[in-house]
A protein has these predicted regions:
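Hydrophobic beta-strand scaffold residues
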Residues: 35, 106, 139-140
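Short, ordered loop/turn segments at secondary-structure junctions
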Residues: 41-43, 84, 104, 110-114, ...
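Short, hinge-like loop/turn segments at secondary-structure boundaries
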Residues: 52-57, 125-128, 158-161
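Rossmann-fold NAD(P)-binding glycine/threonine-rich loop
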Residues: 93-94, 102, 109-138
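Conserved anion/nucleotide-ligand pocket segment
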Residues: 141-167
Length: 167
């Protein structure tokens, strides 16, 4: 059964690009979430407050860093991963594996191939991610950049007038 937590879910935001900036603002807006860290790859963003990076008009008291080890050492409950993965697919997989093994849940915008990887990606790759999650007691959810629309609702809408769908 679902229970309400007494303490907020401690979250690290991984990147402050377009989606990452929106994620920082969304995390801040939810009282059940606590932003505890922000990863950036751009040296110019290191040390800048997450609120400013997100385009908010206030500081959130969380300075961005490029120190991966320091962020993992915080022991966050979850990482919201919005770093670009379509052109650095294996980099994303390696990041997810590391986070899962460390016991950190991951919610990611990509790579979209992980939304349903069976029959697309090698089973060994899928099995390795699953094993990392089991070993760390953590989960991975890839929702894409547009959850609730393109990959789940749009196909239903587009096929709603169909009499038959051949798979």
């Amino acid at each position: 059964s679902m229970t309400i937590r007494d303490v907020p879910i401690r979250v690290v935001e991984w990147s402050t690009g377009y989606l990452g900036r929106m994620a920082v603002e969304a995390i801040d807006a939810r009282p059940e979430l606590e932003l505890v860290g922000v990863f950036v790859s751009d040296p110019a963003k290191v040390g800048v407050d997450a609120g400013r990076l997100a385009g908010m008009d206030r500081d959130l008291g969380v300075a961005a860093t490029d120190d991966r080890a320091a962020l993992l050492a915080l022991g966050p409950d979850a990482i919201v991963y919005t770093a670009e993965t379509e052109t650095r697919f294996m980099g994303g997989i390696e990041d997810f594996t590391e986070f899962l093994r460390a016991g950190i849940n991951v919610v990611a915008s990509g790579p979209v191939l992980l939304q349903y990887p069976h029959g697309i990606l090698p089973e060994e790759m899928i099995d390795a991610l699953a094993a990392a999650g089991r070993d760390g007691g953590a989960t991975l959810h890839v929702g894409g950049i547009d959850p609730g629309f393109a990959n789940d609702v749009l196909p239903l809408a587009m096929t709603s007038l169909s009499r038959r769908i051949d798979l």
